């Protein structure tokens, strides 16, 4: 887009609101094309997709379990799937086939998912040479555990524990164009800590950034922009700000302010790129009106 910093401040646009109230467990993921798929959460199995072309929501087959806090979706473009964890203190783990629009359950999670739980898939369709068989799972909610799921083996392996317990608002993102060996992990639980997990070394290190002045907790979520090596981060519930972490410099900078606060433990962010246009979509995560979906143009 032919826009410039300062002269063209990012404009927050109101999109079609969700047909159902959002809450703990609302989880979104872009499929790389026309749709953002989303679990409603709110202790329900409702599943939808949002058409970024037509600004319209569509009902889809229900998830195999009720989703709540800790639910999350992860795209697997090489298999044309979305992987999903249940949250809600459950061990449900499944995938949604984007071709047949059907669900299939797989091995149960080795530890219950709840506040701060996350999954990361290292996909060779996103980065050549990545191990396409792996999904990493952190139960968080006071646990420092990390597991690796083998898709071919349908089994979990315990890995090195995080340096400290992960809490509500923890999230992991695979920063594959910055370093394909690393998963960036926001610790959550009200702390300012951010870690890097080395996939090859099965080891953890601190990620230094500035200013490290905000404690991430319930409601935090993050998405990665592989074009710029920025990570977009929403803060804890009750805030209106989206920040942006520059991985190359370690600087945490403001990106935009939303019209209203966002709430609940929702995986609310989706970064969508179609042609030369890129937008950050934000699902508010609140059970009361307006059931907002916003988008912000990303042009610098």
Regions found by a protein language model. Give the residues of each.
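Repeated scaffold domains used in trafficking and secretory/extracellular systems
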Residues: 21-29, 66-74, 114-126, 166-175, ...
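Short coil/turn segments that connect the beta-strands within blades of beta-propeller domains
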Residues: 33-34, 78-80, 131-133, 180-181, ...
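Short glycine/acidic-enriched loop and turn motifs that connect beta-strands
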Residues: 42-45, 88-91, 141-144, 189-192, ...
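Loop/turn-rich, solvent-exposed surfaces of beta-rich toroidal or solenoidal domains
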Residues: 217-228, 232-240
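Trp- and S/T/G-rich repeat-edge/linker motifs of beta-rich repeat architectures
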Residues: 3-22, 45-68, 92-115, 145-167, ...
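Solenoidal tandem-repeat scaffolds enriched in leucines and small polar residues
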Residues: 123, 137-138, 146, 171
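Blade-level signature of beta-propeller repeat domains, shared across WD40, Kelch, NHL, RCC1
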Residues: 265-300
């Amino acid at each position: 887009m032919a826009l410039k910093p300062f002269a063209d401040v990012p404009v927050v646009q109101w999109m079609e609101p969700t047909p159902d109230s959002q809450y703990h467990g609302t989880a979104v993921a872009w499929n790389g094309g026309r749709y953002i798929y989303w679990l409603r959460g709110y202790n329900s199995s409702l599943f939808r997709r949002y058409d970024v072309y037509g600004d319209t929501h569509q009902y889809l087959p229900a998830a195999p379990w009720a989703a709540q806090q800790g639910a999350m979706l992860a795209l697997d473009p090489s298999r044309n799937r979305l992987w999903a964890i249940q949250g809600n203190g459950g061990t449900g783990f499944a995938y949604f086939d984007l071709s047949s629009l059907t669900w299939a359950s797989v091995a149960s999670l080795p530890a219950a998912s709840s506040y701060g739980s996350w999954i990361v898939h290292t996909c060779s369709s996103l980065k050549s040479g990545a191990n396409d068989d792996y999904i990493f799972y952190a139960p968080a909610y006071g646990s420092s555990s990390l597991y690796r799921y083998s898709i071919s083996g349908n089994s979990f392996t315990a890995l090195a524990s995080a340096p400290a317990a992960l809490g509500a608002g923890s999230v992991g993102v695979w920063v594959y164009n910055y370093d394909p060996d690393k998963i960036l992990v926001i610790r959550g639980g009200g702390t300012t800590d951010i870690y890097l997990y080395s996939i090859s070394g099965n080891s953890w290190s601190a990620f230094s950034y500035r200013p490290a002045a905000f404690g991430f907790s319930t409601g935090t979520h993050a998405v990665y922009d592989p074009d710029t090596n920025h990570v977009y981060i929403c803060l804890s519930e009750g805030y209106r700000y989206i920040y942006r972490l520059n991985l190359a410099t370690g600087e945490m900078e403001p990106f935009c302010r939303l019209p209203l606060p966002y709430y609940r433990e929702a995986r609310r962010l989706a970064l969508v790129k179609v042609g030369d246009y890129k937008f950050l979509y934000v699902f508010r995560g609140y059970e009361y009106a307006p059931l907002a979906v916003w988008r912000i143009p990303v042009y610098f």
